[in-house]
């Protein structure tokens, strides 16, 4: 679980304090006035400026303002939109809400396995960063490849020139290690004495000699980058490091010369760079800050959409609670796609086990488990821990590699050789010091080396650790520490054990725990395919809100939404209905539900149409445009199932070319003197029991572009044909409604919806731990012979005919979302599922007895081996 708002608040503070900057919404006005939400939505995007003490704009309209952060509170007046829609953690571009997922990639900070035609498969590789060029701000890298079988080290630098590995390489390695440019506070670990400097090649061989006992697809070999970390890298590499150099130079110069050189007030210092940052944010390509390979791939394969595609996720309101900040997206390319779908065993308890996102990108999107977190990088904290160990003599300096005894361990930091060693007997104290206070530091151990790792993109899980069987501390463990048998905590000599107290919740994300709060038992009692149906429909579910008589229409989300009575509201996606398992005249065949004639549910449809046009004017001509919307008596029902809405009249002294297909809109044109008059009509569909709640039209003119925004809000209480899904993953559509008040409980509660008995049995559902009452048909509970039937208070979701819906290939036109779709599909998969599944067991009996012999025939053995996917148990 990561908190995006907290991460960004810390980032804003860090930048402000380090570079002495002040944030303002617009450097041109520099006013402190707070804006309304609608004003931000009308602007291009929600990005702000950062001014220095001379009031020059350092970062010009390129700092993203994340909703819910302190910057957002500084610039915007809070309103009801926040509370109802969970928008915290999202950002806004072009009036759309977006979130950025955590990005998972292979870990190239530590020693790792790799595939390269030049080297054998068993070789291991490490990149040493260092040899920093302050002038050009380049952090060069050298690639070390180690072949364990021949005990040979190969080295090549970024210019692909291979070094011959001789004694001379020691001095090159020292240059890279001593000045990593990545973890400055820890540079004292890499100050070697004269003798040790000559042994660096040997030292690195010892480190790289240990076996990597996890595969390239394991979570132990992954790092996950957070949104805030990538934004910080982008701002720093594009603008802030250049600005820092200017600051350093200014500090060196004399104060008088600075006064003469001072720029004029309100200038923008880095206009081009700021535009580059905005492009990067808009195109969702933050990952290029980390990996140069991706930007190269884009140039080489312009059509390869995978890595160069936009990672921003557009979000429709209201946002699923706890979704933002917990989504993880894998970066894959087409050749890797199939392999990457695998989830290795060490994903368990770190990455949610149930919700694997859409079918189209299966294996690419995940959610973090509730106890998993992505800690921030803090090399200062690690440096303090090493200083503490030195002060208390728990570690000592290495003078000569050959002097290190068998009772000692060399210490490596991020798989780099350091100048420290420790006694094996002190290991548990070192574990206690390093791991306490939930420090995100990974520890590994071999017979010669203690590995201490702390780098960007670590993924950790919160656990309790018992040290020396006496002290319990709360710690953060990495996948390697928690899952692998070679982990330091499964080593009996170290005497550190993990205290376990987990149930099925440890496999779930916070999002799932919130929406399935009182129904967690479903996750270990219901078949997994049904859970996936339930979770996928939760994602596509229509927003649910409490019905209020007054002002129900004002804050509606776009598209369909559901207003329900407060008594049945569960959360912003679910409501409860009393459910009776029964059928009537086969109305529930093929999975429909029979609803009660009067449910406390109202369906709203908020449709926003944007009609665009271009004024035909010369480059410097001005133009008059006026729009009058028709406020009353402005619609008429037509015979063909449509409603015609007269939106209004637009008058202009220039001609307008409208962009429309002539189907949804009708525009009548005429001229009046020098003016062009346009009457705009809009068609929309009639549905049963439709009530027109709001019709509105307004105009925005920007340069020579004209846009009419037309809002149509309708509601209906007729739910026939709408898709519904129960919390158990039983989906269907509403059939014709019936009066269900005859199924009455003693307290006056009656059934509200009927579930198909066949569906209930075949889905292996169970209604354990769900509120139930007993009803009698006719409601006469005094009759002792009257049969009692249970009704269950089950949560339901209504969901849309989404465009990527399975049925789209059969029903080409989904006009209202009320079209019935069950029973339309009869392709190979459906035939196989329904026909073969139900007949297979019968035909097996026939085959088994077909030869009239006591032994099973070969045909029976072959066909019974195909019974993998059916819930069939065979008894001899």
Curated annotation (Swiss-Prot):
It comes from the Viruses. Keywords: DNA-directed RNA polymerase, Nucleotidyltransferase, Transcription, Transcription regulation, Transferase. It catalyses: RNA(n) + a ribonucleoside 5'-triphosphate = RNA(n+1) + diphosphate. The keyword Transcription applies. One of its GO terms (molecular function) is DNA binding. InterPro entries: DNA-dir_RNAP_su2_hyb_sf, LEF-8, RNA_pol_bsu_CS. GO terms for cellular component: DNA-directed RNA polymerase complex. Its EC number is 2.7.7.6. GO terms for biological process: DNA-templated transcription; DNA-templated viral transcription. Interacts with LEF-4, LEF-9, and p47. Component of the viral DNA-dependent RNA polymerase which is composed of four equimolar subunits of LEF-4, LEF-8, LEF-9, and p47. Plays an essential role in late and very late gene expression. Belongs to the RNA polymerase beta chain family. This is Probable DNA-directed RNA polymerase catalytic subunit. It comes from Autographa californica nuclear polyhedrosis virus.
